[in-house]
Amino acid sequence: MRPASDGSGPAAGARVAAFGLGGGWAELRAVDPAELAVLPDAVDLGTAATLPAAGVSALRAVRRLGSLLGRRVLVTGASGGVGRFAVQLAALSGAHVIASVGTRARGAGLRDLGAAEVVVGLDEVTEPVHAALDNVGGPLLAQALDLVAEHGAVIQIGAASNQPTTLTLAHKLVNKRLDLFVVGEGLTTTPNGVWNFGPDIALLAELVAAHRLTPHIGWRGPWHRAPEAVEALRSRRVAGKAVLDIT
């Protein structure tokens, strides 16, 4: 870590995390200080690496739902990187969280993260929900819309199923909101047009340090094992995030 030439940003040698839209594999990269968060001593770099993309995505999506205190919130793809953060952040916001997963095995540990209910698919969900955070897409997205009460919302964060979604007039979209989530949308920018991710990353890191947020690393290894990590992710053998250590 080298400080900015104008003296702004963290000091030399600071441990930082950033959301980088490009240059993530470079040995050196210029980063606007607004993109950076200085990490608490209790948060190691591997753990911090899970926060900028998955953590910030979940945080921004949960915020878009407004007040969640006492409300039923559905999270699909809850065992994935974004899903696990979404479960925890919605629960921290006071929601009754229903975590949907693909198999019983992938639901392990989600109650410990704050889920009030863990279900396989959505057939077990029989009562309406105030909102849904969807990471799966495909037919499950249409089913989630059916479950959302009038004036509720579905935020589609991802489409892990890689399947099309068919929506009909029966979904009554006039009385429901369907948002396609983009992580940078709504974020303030610096005068140079850089997204101001730093404060959100810092908040997540503080929650981790306080043991209020638990990143789940399902695979971790040296960077030369990257092909192994990719294959584990593609075959859905990783719950949470995969982390490569570069030394």
Question: Which residue stretches match the model-derived regions?
Answer:
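Short glycine-centered segments of the SAM/dcSAM-binding site in methyltransferase folds
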Residues: 15, 72, 96, 152-154, ...
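A short acidic, Gly/Pro-enriched loop at the edge of an enzyme's catalytic core
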Residues: 124-132
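Glycine-rich phosphate-binding loop and adjacent beta-alpha segment
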Residues: 139-212, 246-247
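Mid-domain Rossmann-like dinucleotide-binding core that forms the NAD(H)/NADP(H) cofactor-binding site
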Residues: 51-121
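Glycine-rich beta-strand-centered segment in the early N-terminal region that forms part
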Residues: 1-23, 135
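NAD(P)H dinucleotide-binding glycine-rich loop of Rossmann-like/cofactor-binding domains
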Residues: 16-77
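C-terminal capping/lid region of NAD(P)-dependent oxidoreductase domains
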Residues: 205, 210-217, 227-247
